[in-house]
Amino acid sequence: MRPLAALAVLTATAALLAGAGSARITGTVPRPHIVQKPIPYPAKRRAEMAAYALRHYGIDTWHLVHPHVIVEHYTVSETFSSVYNTFAPDVPDGELGELPGDCSHFVVDKDGTIYQLVPTTIMCRHTVGLNYTAIGIEHVGSSDREILSNPRQLAASLQLTLWLMQQKGIQLRNVIGHNESLTSPYHKELYAPWRCQTHGDWTRADMDVYRAKLAALARRYGVPLGPAARRVTPRC
């Protein structure tokens, strides 16, 4: 989508979030403007991702095939460049010490700019237990509430997420926050010490706010929401 058209989409989304306008728009969700900013993902990193997937999920592949989940994150940093510089080097992550390095498919900046770092056909390490079936979206910022209170960033995030939902056939109940990972029915972790590992970003309470806004946008475009949320007891 051209930048001016993308701006119009974000403006319309922001207006909807503000309560202005309620007309139903049926059809395909427009693709938001996405800036391509790929991180290096050469054969070595792909092989490391396949080895990781074999250890943790029992599948020997780096391909992300038919993802079922979208996981929302925040970066605990203030600039896109700091996020990019964290994800680009293929080094063991500082928390769990494994390769490949952490990454996310998309980053939504504070001004509403959407960056794509990795194709959605490639696994990224962003959520323990779900990387084999999840698209990761990072938001530049330090808290859920900071992002929820930023109209441009929130509008871009919702438009991206809804577009991905329609493109990939992902249901609303499977749009989750990182903090909700353990209760996802898709959570799978073969390495026992990691089965309770999660993060504090995007709690259920804040994701309920996010999902309500996403549902309102989905209804306007006629995107099916799917069945009610299904949560499981953490297997740890």
Predicted stretch roles:
Residues 69, 134-136, 174:
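Structural preference for beta-strand elements that scaffold enzyme active sites
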Residues 3-10, 16-127, 235:
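N-terminal catalytic cores of peptidoglycan-degrading enzymes
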Residues 58-59, 103-104, 141-151:
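Second-shell loop/turn segments in exported
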Residues 65, 99, 130, 146-154:
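Solvent-exposed, acidic/flexible segments
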Residues 25-46, 143-236:
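Basic/polar, cationic surfaces and motifs that engage anionic cell-wall
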Residues 128-139:
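Short coil-to-beta-strand
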